[in-house]
Amino acid sequence: IQLYNFSDGELRVAFEENIRNEDVFIIQSTNPPSSNVLELLFMLDAARRASANRVIAVVPYFGYARQDRKDEPRVPISARVLLDLMNVVGINRIMAMDLHSPQIQGFINTPFDHLYSSMALFDRLKEFNLNFENGVVLAPDVGSAKISQSYAKRLGVGFALIDKRRPK
């Protein structure tokens, strides 16, 4: 894929080879979101317009997943907006890692695979021969308590929940 910025900062995306009837996996994190979300959308659209057989978005970090509901007046549901845009450009599948809010998978009728990095993380931790005797997995908020408890159980360590409050 060739990415090019015009003098005004506008992005141009082009596939440099024929992808007609090919399965195309586009791997793109959405961090930082301002530029990477547009890059992702343009690459997905370019693949579809180049007659790819299937277009699969692999998004290791799915930005805007925290904005999964209308938690106060006059705010968007940004996760939904991003998935609507991905749907409009025409994708066949989405793969994302460790979603902040797994329920966003229901915002789109496209197959959505939610993958967990914990398997690779646990295997890597074993290589360090760490002593987990006094270890604790900390959950930063109530929303992460369930997954944090499962990590603690798998590692055989304690679990703690932090009371996080944001200033208004």
Tell where the protein language model's regions lie, with residue ranges:
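PRPP-associated nucleotide enzymes
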Residues: 1-168
